[in-house]
Curated annotation (Swiss-Prot):
The keyword Magnesium applies. Keywords: Hydrolase, Magnesium, Metal-binding, Nucleotide metabolism, Nucleotide-binding. SUPFAM superfamilies: ITPase-like. Pfam families: Ham1p_like. One of its GO terms (cellular component) is cytosol. It is an enzyme of class 3 (hydrolase). Homodimer. This is dITP/XTP pyrophosphatase. GO terms for biological process: nucleotide metabolic process; purine nucleoside triphosphate catabolic process. Pyrophosphatase that catalyzes the hydrolysis of nucleoside triphosphates to their monophosphate derivatives, with a high preference for the non-canonical purine nucleotides XTP (xanthosine triphosphate), dITP (deoxyinosine triphosphate) and ITP. Seems to function as a house-cleaning enzyme that removes non-canonical purine nucleotides from the nucleotide pool, thus preventing their incorporation into DNA/RNA and avoiding chromosomal lesions. It comes from Borrelia recurrentis (strain A1). Belongs to the HAM1 NTPase family. Its EC number is 3.6.1.66.
Amino acid sequence: MKTLFFATSNINKINEVKQILDIPKIKIEIPQNFDIKETGKTFKENSLLKAKALFKILNNKQPVFSEDSGLCIEALNMEPGIYSKRYDQYKLGKKLDNNEKNHLIIDLMREQNNRTAYFICVISYIDVDGTINNFEGMLKGTIALNIDYYQKNGFGYNPIFLTTNNKRLSELNLEEKNKISHRGIAFDKFKKFLMQFLD
């Protein structure tokens, strides 16, 4: 049994990742009270920052992985981007709930014809010997004209993101979402990488 430590405290990410990395010989541990300031300028920098921080906390002796992801909108100069989680504070200087954050995006996009957007995910894995590998995933879609208040699936910007088949991410259950999402694609690459060493 190989134990991997996941550098996150986001319960939604944990649930998605545990379903994708459902490998019999892999056990995923979540560190308690893990909270690192994301000061990188790219998803990759932030992902590496978190992985390296946890690797150090575990005395450079345990395999760790982290991920950073976000929504990039062409008409908004690829924002929210790395500020996706804290776009409210970056843009308005105050904290908003999820619905309010989605409203902010809808308002900013009100006059925009180009609604093309991307969800991007970067995973950083550090093995026990300190070797680093990165895995990326991207989902292309568009920003909806309004918010889906009724679907209970997904989190964050899922209620305003339309996939190429015109379905909101919030309409998909976890299994459906993981097949096409940025996180699903990146973690599928990571899973295949891990499987090489478990045979």
